[in-house]
Amino acid sequence: LDAMSPLAPLHNPPALAVIRACQEERPDLPQVGVFDTAFFHALPDYVRAYALPAEWTEQSQPIRRYGFHGLAHRCMVERFATIHAANDTSTRVITLQLGHGCSVAAIRNGEAIETSMGFTPLEGLIMATRPGDLDAGVLLHLLERGVVSITELNDALNHRSGLLGPVSYTTLTLPATWEG
């Protein structure tokens, strides 16, 4: 998990801190890891593949769409099936995870067939502090011109973008928005 922390810096370090605290306080208790990316393990190849050169994507840690918020999406699908007495073999559902992090998933026959999040939790919908989908050319432009370092870019993409970005959504209120 330490090695994966750069891919999900808002999620993995706090989870590792809890794991280590539990190990220290109660080393006798077994710990079980449940990864929310597992819900997306069967994404079709054409969905999980990025249109990049194979030598980049076929590494020890393959570059592909993993999807995130799988525990929430699975729970929503199960709840939908309970409420509507739906049979997983005939159900098509779109689920939305809306919180500090946001994602959309399409589920057919109880299996995820599409997700808005990809290799990292940065991809997809605009979130509280993450930009969501972003033209890679913007990042190249910033790096090539020396506007930001890789470290600064990583920090900005995870902590200072999205609804906290330059549009300043944080200053909007619903009544003001409704008033036009």
Task: List each model region and its residues.
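Divalent-metal (Mg2+/Mn2+/Ca2+)-assisted nucleotide/phosphate chemistry catalytic cores
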Residues: 1-70
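Glycine-rich phosphate-binding loop of actin/hexokinase-like ATP-binding domains
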Residues: 42-145
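Beta-strand segments within the central parallel beta-sheet cores of soluble alpha/beta enzyme folds
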Residues: 92-96, 151-159
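Conserved small/polar residues in nucleotide/adenosyl-binding loops
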Residues: 170-176
